[in-house]
Amino acid sequence: MTNIRKIHPLMKIMNNSFIDLPAPSNISSWWNFGSLLGACLALQIVTGLFLAMHYTADTTTAFSSVTHICRDVNYGWVIRYLHTNGASMFFLCLFIHVGRGLYYGSFSLSETWNIGIILLLTVMATAFMGYVLPWGQMSFWGATVITNLLSAIPYIGSDLVEWIWGGFSVDKATLTRFFAFHFILPLIIAALVMVHLLFLHETGFNNPLGVSSNPDKIPFHPYYTTKDLLGVILLILPLMTLVLFFPDLLGDPDNYTPANPLNTPPHIKPEWYFLFAYAILRSIPNKLGEVLALISSILILAIIPLLQTAKQQSMMFRPLSQCLFWVLVADLYTLTWIGGQPVENPFITIGQAASILYFSLILIIMPMVSLIENKMLKW
């Protein structure tokens, strides 16, 4: 008799996606981050739902409602800090996931890669709007500065900003719509994840060697379900350490001051996971230029498949490209550090140099080095 999981219409989909899915026998722990991102998304949706039950999206009560959650709601502080620090873990996994795709040439699966970029942009938009909701000083001024960048768009810029604000400044209308979008976007992200997986299962997995996975495949369960479960446990450890011992380590002290439109904080900066893009934005003195640089810093991922000159898909056997990849990682670390520093020398100069290096590495240096490697390996 055929197992019910293979014939039941609903269970069959689950079975083909997570149980009998043919997976390469040699994918390493770097492939764990997809499932960790799924776990992070589930955590964010659940904790966010409970927070939404007690939060009020009104400028007069938003800040006090967050305080009420932390002080008066049973385990409200755990839910709140799981949500804020869960976002940090989400982005950490996202960056590693994208980095793994770059290192092992997963961008050759173009549909999966492009949906991934859309997912990255959607998650960034969701996180930005979520940061505005507690209505602290950094929430208010972060929203003002970032939304105001749209005024650099010719002709329609000013109208667009006022349309997003719902008035002539960041106010009640802005907070209400940001809460509405912050609530609905994770559900859209979940739908996009399904599309991401659909395309991935159409083409099959990449693997560390960058060769065809077809000759040797194993079922996803129990091998990779067990491996993913270990990954989830290892992710829970640092997350719970942050939540229970250092809940405000990654936050900004200014956000514990209620929003005040008449008092600008000395250093306006976003959460740590946006600092690299913020540093690139700040390194250009022209307003339209900085908006284009900010967008390009993410959308540059979309043209990476077009810049691929290497004859080998993976960087596994390309030591020069490996060195450049880690230079790129170090450059992103530098940009993240610079984004959190005040706008003064030498930070401005370092930020500009790191921004130029970031674009040069991806657009010029890495494709050229790949061509040199082709010659060296006599491809």
From Swiss-Prot:
Membrane-spanning ranges: 33-53, 77-98, 113-133, 178-198, 226-246, 288-308, 320-340, 347-367
Binding site for heme b b566: H97, H196
Residues annotated as binding a ubiquinone: H201
One cellular component term from this protein's GO annotations in UniProt: mitochondrial inner membrane
Cofactor comment: Binds 2 heme b groups non-covalently.
Cell compartment(s), UniProt: Mitochondrion inner membrane
InterPro entries: Cyt_b/b6_C (IPR005798), Cyt_b/b6_C_sf (IPR036150), Cyt_b/b6_N (IPR005797), Cytb/b6-like_sf (IPR027387), Cytochrome_b (IPR030689), Cytochrome_b_C_euk/bac (IPR048260), Cytochrome_b_N_euk/bac (IPR048259), Di-haem_cyt_TM (IPR016174)
Free-text function comment from the UniProt entry: Component of the ubiquinol-cytochrome c reductase complex (complex III or cytochrome b-c1 complex) that is part of the mitochondrial respiratory chain. The b-c1 complex mediates electron transfer from ubiquinol to cytochrome c. Contributes to the generation of a proton gradient across the mitochondrial membrane that is then used for ATP synthesis.
UniProt similarity note: Belongs to the cytochrome b family.
Additional observations: Heme 1 (or BL or b562) is low-potential and absorbs at about 562 nm, and heme 2 (or BH or b566) is high-potential and absorbs at about 566 nm.
Subunit structure: The cytochrome bc1 complex contains 11 subunits: 3 respiratory subunits (MT-CYB, CYC1 and UQCRFS1), 2 core proteins (UQCRC1 and UQCRC2) and 6 low-molecular weight proteins (UQCRH/QCR6, UQCRB/QCR7, UQCRQ/QCR8, UQCR10/QCR9, UQCR11/QCR10 and a cleavage product of UQCRFS1). This cytochrome bc1 complex then forms a dimer.
Protein name: Cytochrome b
Organism for this UniProt entry: Avahi laniger
